[in-house]
Amino acid sequence: MLKQRTIKSLVKTVGIGLHSGRKVTLTLRPAAAGTGIVFTRVDLDPAVEIPATASAIGDTRLASVLQKDGARVSTVEHLMSACAGLGIDNLYVDVDAEEIPIMDGSAASFVFLLQSAGIEEQGAAKRFIRVTKPVEIREGDKLARLDPYFGFKLSFTIEFRHPAVDKTGQTFEIDFADTSYTREIARARTFGFAHEVEMLREVGLARGGSLDNAIVLDEHRMLNNDELRYGDEFVRHKILDAIGDLYVVGHPLIAAYTAHKSGHGLNNALLRALLADETAYEIVTFDKIEEAPRAFLPQLQPAFS
């Protein structure tokens, strides 16, 4: 039986909120089978638990934001992406601010944190959402689509007309049947443009943003002194984001995802459209491990590798 997973022990880290610029303490705790991934604002009295679900995503302008009863947890996509990449089904995420810390702008720190805690199987079957017919969302020239596929693969195209981005490639495809999340996706950093950062700071946002946690571009070049971690790091980060955005559906997807200029909002709209059509998906488990898609086999996890 392909089993659910959680972490073995509590693990904690401290980082900076991308928009607030304030110190954030993040604590990850094991959770029982069937719990899902639950975020808790422990700084509130009483504390507010917000399960990671597609319907709980509210604001998507700058990040994926979970909301409940006036409480918010922002920028959850990188941690959710790491959980998807490591096959974590159940986890308590305690945070003492309204943002998950940005760390280095990728999912690598969260992968390290989860692996440091240890990953263990639980006595319940891992549940998957298998897409059974195409689901598509369009918004102008933007597209996000899910198709039936016995595995998990993603294809993403961006369109940023900038010299530094143009020369790195604007399309990337990955199939986790034969590719490692930790090697090929987890280290891709978020990116932004210097003039946009200044505009955000003028309205009290991006106070924690720096060259230490993002790739920053001016009109002509990359301002960071270090090299890109991947030749096409920009589009790979969009795939990292998409994996995290899609994981709030509640279970790993057995599907092919295709996107053109998609973002957090369109990705969430795609999940809502999927869940609204009961004929578009089914919940499945695998009693025999060898019958599961290769991307999710034990030898490819934790970390799809």
Curated annotation (Swiss-Prot):
Keywords: Hydrolase, Lipid A biosynthesis, Lipid biosynthesis, Lipid metabolism, Metal-binding, Zinc
GO BP term, example: lipid A biosynthetic process
Gene Ontology MF annotations: metal ion binding; UDP-3-O-acyl-N-acetylglucosamine deacetylase activity
KW Lipid metabolism (keyword) present: yes
Disulfide bonds listed in the record: none
Residues engaged in binding Zn(2+): H78, H237, D241
Xref: Gene3D superfamilies: lpxc deacetylase, domain 1 (3.30.230.20), lpxc deacetylase, domain 2 (3.30.1700.10)
Gene Ontology CC: membrane
Function, as annotated: Catalyzes the hydrolysis of UDP-3-O-myristoyl-N-acetylglucosamine to form UDP-3-O-myristoylglucosamine and acetate, the committed step in lipid A biosynthesis.
HAMAP family in UniProt: LpxC
Protein name, entry field: UDP-3-O-acyl-N-acetylglucosamine deacetylase
